[in-house]
Amino acid sequence: MPKQDSLWLKSLRWIQKHLVHTIVVPQDPFADLNLDASRPLAYVMKTESLSDIAALSEITTKLGLPSPYEPLVVNGVVAPRVVCLEGRKPLFGERASNEPFLECFMRLLAVHKEKPELDIQLVPVSLYWGRTPGKEDDTMKAAVLERENPTWLRKCLMILFLGRHNFVQFSNAVSLRYMADEHGTDMGIAHKLARVARVHFRRQRKVMTGPVLPNRQAMFHSLLKSESLRKAIQEEAASKKISETQARETAIEYLDEIAANYSDSLVRIAERFLTWLWNKLYSGINIKGAEQIRQLHHDGHEIVYVPCHRSHMDYLLLSYILYYQGMVPPHIAAGINLNFWPAGPLFRRGGAFFIRRSFNGNKLYTAVFREYLDQLFAKGYSVEYFSEGGRSRTGRLLAPKTGMIAMTINSVLRGIERPVTLVPVYLGYDHVMEVATYHKELSGKKKQKESVWQVFGAIRKLGNFGQGYVNFGEPITLQNFLNETAPNWRAEVADDPEQKPTWLTPAVNVLANRVMTRINDAAAASSITLTSLVLLASEQNALERCLLERQLDLYLTLLKRVPYTSFTSVAEGDGKHLVQQGLELNKFSINADPLGEIVSIDANQAISMTYYRNNIIHLFIIPSLIASCLTNNKQISRAHILGIVSDFYPLLKAELFMGIKDLPSYVNQVLDLFIEQGLVQESDTLSVVTEHTSQMLLLAGSVSETLQRYAIIFNLLAHRPKMERSELESESHLLAQRLGALHGITAPEFYDKKLYNTLSVKLKELGYFSEKEDKSDVERIRDQANSLLRASVRQTIVASVTAEHIV
């Protein structure tokens, strides 16, 4: 390797500095890959390349990592900082032997034998000039821009045309101490290291670029030859009394309507536009858990992303983040309503495939869609769909639509060998552009049809929207899920592939709910969501600034000391910092008087802010319920609190997709924290410390509307034990409207009919609609709910339930 200060390398670095723009994956290798700055470090690269090392040198300088030009000096032994698996490819002739590079491995291993305390970190580094996967019929372009093994001439062309799309990816370090201790230090181990590294680099390239793209028309013809589609076409012809040719043409029309037409060129252009857009919209995008997903890709999993659905921005945000995290944007299942000009064709070339809201018993369309989805999985393309089926209008997760999840499981049952893994994704925003529209729709206004004018209208209103949040939840590998749910599933499917297993529908429902629960497990508690939660629990949606900051400090402590899950993310900073962030985004108002500052939510903004509160209310609903038990009882035992929480938890779990694994332990940890923080004192029983009553009342306020709903339901059930589910839903909704009008409850979800349907389904599952005479459970929970309400609210509910018109 030429010396760093040689004229040749200086000239090369100067040229590349002006032609090359490099993106680093991950952005902070020290933090994301747990590199140890105190231990020696060497780089492993696939191919020796002056331009690659020059690009790496620029990055290591910015990150504070050792320069690839600096030799590695350990225990008197001098070795190159970069170990390459193979030499440069000459313009003509054979590549040089890789023996010099194996000798580097040998020298580094030998030093470990001599010095037991030494542990060199071997960090694989991959460089990519562009990320085009190529097409199945690609010839000329592949020849000119051969990316895996380019000659110096081809590399010059790549830098010239693709220099602005250079990616440098660092991987987890390999401990040479471990290799030396476990496997020895001979030449055989050096060869083994080289083989493992080659496999790693091959897989890494597949993760970064994705599989080759199909020729769309060739793919259509291939799909039409499949046995299931041939059979569906024959059945369509017979049922509609048309020729098979006509039925086949209909199938082609369906394929053309559904199928994506992924274009790497469009993705590169979109990347530049989206970089501009995010910089204009957001002050930052916070990402958690991307490394585990990269590893799943690397291990050969078929990845299906299942995000929550807050905004039309979701389609763009997740694809953009995955691209910059060194993964390929997925093929996205989009509603057919988004297939309008010019957005539809652009979305399609960005990887969207379109799905009708309802298949309406159209067997041919169903068969075409299933076969297309199977093809995506078989070819190794990652897929994304929104299991909620539409955007949440309240900020809470919607009950899942199980169609796409069922199709995914069916693809596994039909014999996909690679592990298929669902990745729940929490998407959050400090500002959702559509919130105002959502509340108009909830109040009865008809939903507007998507159009290009809506897009232009949204872009015209772009401003400072704070931060975005992308948290990857705990993955679910479907083969493991099926082994857990139906241990003999492989044998059952092999015996009768056409027969639908009896356990399939219940398994799909369980899986859908597990996905939603794991999305909520990965929630992001941000400055906006936390501050909204506090202010909306106050009487006038207003608090003294110092009290607001103190309450936020308590919530931050609670989330950090008693974490909801390890996948949840919590805002950085203290309460003071969070309040300031909210004020800078104009989400809250501040007024000063001689006694201090008051932070409030404007009356016309209160309904909108419930959306952000609802994003994270599940994180605080149990602590809030505990606080409600404490503030409504002068003395109360731990056992009594746990009993109340245990009675309400099944409903909370169904409504808010909660997944607390050990409820008694969680309740006790929260109580212990309250005691440690001086909020609660304990002798034989628990009681609130007088000077902290206001803090506990504020925390208790977050569960009040939920308890009011439960009080309505259980008062109705206790008063009319034999009422039907449909009656309970309609009369609960009617009472909620009355209660809201009398007591000023404006939260949209309080009047959401779907929510009462979800609760009634859970109540039936729990046996509350049974014919048995003993209604002590219903009466007990009714009394518990009533005891936790304000007297005026309780009186309204009881009086309304017993009134003649409701009976």
Swiss-Prot record:
Sequence motif: HXXXXD motif, positions: 308-313
GO cellular component terms attached to this protein's record: plasma membrane
Cysteine disulfide links: none
UniProtKB keywords: Acyltransferase, Cell inner membrane, Cell membrane, Lipid biosynthesis, Lipid metabolism, Membrane, Phospholipid biosynthesis, Phospholipid metabolism, Transferase
Catalyzed reactions: sn-glycerol 3-phosphate + an acyl-CoA = a 1-acyl-sn-glycero-3-phosphate + CoA
Source superkingdom: Bacteria
Localization in the cell: Cell inner membrane
Enzyme's top EC category: transferase
Membrane disposition: Peripheral membrane protein
EC number(s) recorded for this UniProt protein: 2.3.1.15
Pathway the protein contributes to: Phospholipid metabolism; CDP-diacylglycerol biosynthesis; CDP-diacylglycerol from sn-glycerol 3-phosphate: step 1/3
Pfam families per UniProt: Acyltransferase (PF01553), GPAT_C (PF19277)
Record PANTHER family: DIHYDROXYACETONE PHOSPHATE ACYLTRANSFERASE, GLYCEROL-3-PHOSPHATE ACYLTRANSFERASE
Domain notes for this protein: The HXXXXD motif is essential for acyltransferase activity and may constitute the binding site for the phosphate moiety of the glycerol-3-phosphate.
Family of this protein: Belongs to the GPAT/DAPAT family.
NCBIfam families assigned to the protein according to its UniProt record, in alphabetical order: plsB (TIGR03703), PRK04974.1 (NF003441)
Protein name per its UniProtKB record: Glycerol-3-phosphate acyltransferase
Source species of the chain: Shewanella sp. (strain MR-4)
